[in-house]
Amino acid sequence: MAVRRTPTREGRPSPPAAAPVRNGILAALLATEYQRLLPKLEHVALKRGEIIYRADQDIEAVYFPEEAVVAMIDTTDDGRTTEVGIIGREGIVGINIFLGGAVTPDRAIVQIPGGAFRMKSNDLRKDVRFGSPLQRVLLQYTRTFIAVISQSVACSQHHHIEQRVARWLLTMNDYSGSREFQM
């Protein structure tokens, strides 16, 4: 069955109406809550190497990846870079907006290309109110994201390079939903 994308009032293609929800946060919402958010979501294709955010710049939109995987990269004063987080189909890029911030301390760069839903930061702020279904799902994701970052830091300190590469490959597989990806 072919999925039709109909133009919205702004002329952008709408998200696929018949397609299953592939982002973990959006999929965890009740169907009525997801349908309420749908007009605020724009389906976009993220390209490998695309910079979504630059460090210390305003976050204008958040992204809910489907197949895409985005790395959060920290750059030290002397120019060295470190991957400090990976976000794929389980999460949201731009979590600082949910946490009350307006900027990101890190650069967000697409590692694996694919689809994502983009939502304006102001729309997310309005939709995340105390006790809302979206707020509850984002809180659960935030707790999980922090645990994954903690595990990643421990792995980088205590494991050999082969083990770290294996963890990274498994993470890419989990977060992209694909066994194949470009390197």
Model-derived features: positions:
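Cyclic nucleotide-binding regulatory domains
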Residues: 50-113
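Cyclic nucleotide-binding regulatory module and flanking cytosolic helices
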Residues: 2-47, 92, 98, 130
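A residue-level structural signature of the nucleotidyltransferase/glycosyltransferase Rossmann-like core
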Residues: 18, 26, 62, 84, ...
